[in-house]
Each structure stands twice: as structure tokens, then as C-alpha cells.
């Protein structure tokens, strides 16, 4: 047998490192994030509900098959100097609202501006579509539940983003 040499290294003292706590931009950020997240999910779900009652048209069918009028694409339908936006916009703004909400809940940073902007743009597009449907003056065609959901939950997301932005500015001052 051969002699084996063993080298023994003295243990170095271990320095305790406190775990990094996640950054919460303001105390109500998880609540604002949760409200915005639920609103964003409901904006996405609104795509699959009826957008024009009496016709069976959903936001998804407007995007995938075309809506009504003389000109249709996956973004909007036009006809008679009126425009109705498709479900693409509710999907886009819903995803942006949810992304902003996730950053607020997880503490990665304050995405209040993203939630606020997506909520406002979603509200503008949904209200514009609602107004355009009402101007058709056809008793059988009215805005459906999906379009109303898109408007209401975009408004809620915009308010949540606005409250969050206000809280961020308040925390920065004090």
C-alpha cells in the first residue's frame, strides 16, 4: 500500500448574510396589484363574451373571423363611417395590466404607470366602440356584455394604477 497524504484545510468563518427582502414601492402595492391583476384577467376574459348583442359577435370572433361592416381586419371593423375595435385590444391591454400587477405584487418594481396607461387606453377603445355601436340606430344591435366588461374593468385598472402612482409620489415626497 502506498501512503496517501491528506491535506486538511481549516474552515473559514462563515459570514451571515441577511436574506434580501423584496422591495415594495409603497405599503398598498400588493393590494393595488391584486385589484389590477383581477381587472386585467377580466379584461382578457371579456374578449370571449358577446361584444355586439343580437349578432353573436364576440371580441374574439371579430379578431379571428372579421366583424361587421365593409372593412374588417384583426384590429377593427369599419362601415358607414363607424369603427368598432376587435378583441385584440382587450387581449393586449389585459396582458399589460396583468404584467404591471405582477410586478407590483412580487415587489419587482412599481409598474403603476403601465397599469394606468393600459387601463386608460382600454377604456378609450371600449367606450369608442360602445358609442359607435349605439350610433348605428338599429334596435337589434347594442353593445354586448363583453364590451361593457372591457370598459368597466379597464376603468377599475386605470383607477388602481392612478392610486398606485399617487402613492408612489407621496412616498417619494416623505
Tell where the protein language model's regions lie, with residue ranges:
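Compact integral membrane and secretory-pathway proteins
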Residues: 2-174
Amino acid at each position: 500500500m502506498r501512503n496517501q497524504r491528506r491535506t486538511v484545510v481549516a474552515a473559514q468563518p462563515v459570514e451571515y448574510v441577511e436574506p434580501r427582502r423584496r422591495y415594495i414601492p409603497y405599503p398598498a402595492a400588493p393590494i393595488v396589484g391584486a385589484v389590477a391583476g383581477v381587472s386585467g384577467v377580466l379584461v382578457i376574459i371579456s374578449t370571449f363574451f358577446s361584444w355586439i348583442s343580437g349578432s353573436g359577435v364576440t371580441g374574439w370572433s371579430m379578431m379571428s373571423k372579421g366583424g361587421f361592416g365593409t372593412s374588417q381586419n384583426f384590429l377593427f371593423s369599419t362601415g358607414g363611417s363607424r369603427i368598432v375595435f376587435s378583441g385584440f385590444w382587450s387581449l393586449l391591454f389585459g396582458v399589460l395590466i396583468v404584467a404591471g400587477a405582477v410586478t407590483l405584487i412580487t415587489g419587482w418594481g412599481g409598474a403603476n404607470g403601465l397599469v394606468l396607461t393600459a387601463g386608460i387606453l382600454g377604456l378609450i377603445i371600449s367606450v369608442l366602440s360602445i358609442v359607435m355601436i349605439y350610433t348605428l340606430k338599429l334596435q337589434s344591435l347594442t353593445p354586448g356584455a363583453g364590451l361593457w366588461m372591457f370598459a368597466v374593468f379597464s376603468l377599475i385598472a386605470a383607477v388602481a394604477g392612478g392610486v398606485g402612482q399617487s402613492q408612489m409620489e407621496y412616498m417619494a415626497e416623505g
